[in-house]
């Protein structure tokens, strides 16, 4: 059976993926404990930045304790900064390989992130390359 928190999490992810200003009625009923669980789910699925992007400006989020809001925002921003840095490093490495005449085929990571409306909000831990 899917919980209220999981239902809210899925609604938030759907709102992120569709870039629609969703009517997130599921958030209104969440307790602080459920909000914490929602953020844990988001972190487990590497979607904390995406979830924060959707909920960060909602009245429901504004009602959470300052420390929780600050913690979620900090973790989301750190994730984004780390991803931007990893992406820049990857692009530099890819360019160097191409200058050496090596044409790598990017298998996932940056390619999969490009499917998201805001790719830097979906971190990837590594980039898989096929080098012929």
What function would you assign to each model-found segment?
Residues 61, 116-117:
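Short Asp/Glu-rich motifs
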Residues 2-7, 18-108:
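Helical scaffold of the NTase/Pol beta-like nucleotidyltransferase catalytic core
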Residues 111-113:
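Short, solvent-exposed loop/turn segments at secondary-structure junctions
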Residues 117-132:
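Catalytic metal-binding acidic patch
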């Amino acid at each position: 059976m899917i919980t209220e928190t999981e239902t809210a999490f899925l609604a938030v992810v759907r709102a992120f993926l569709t870039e629609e200003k969703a009517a997130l009625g599921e958030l209104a009923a969440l307790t602080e404990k459920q909000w914490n669980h929602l953020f844990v789910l988001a972190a487990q699925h590497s979607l904390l930045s995406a979830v924060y992007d959707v909920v960060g400006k909602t009245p429901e989020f504004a009602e959470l304790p300052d420390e929780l809001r600050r913690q979620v925002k900090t973790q989301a921003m750190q994730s984004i900064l780390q991803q931007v840095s990893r992406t820049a490093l990857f692009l530099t490495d890819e360019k160097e390989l191409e200058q050496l005449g090596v044409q790598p085929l990017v298998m996932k990571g940056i390619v999969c992130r490009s499917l998201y409306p805001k790719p830097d909000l979906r971190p990837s831990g590594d980039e898989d390359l096929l080098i012929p």
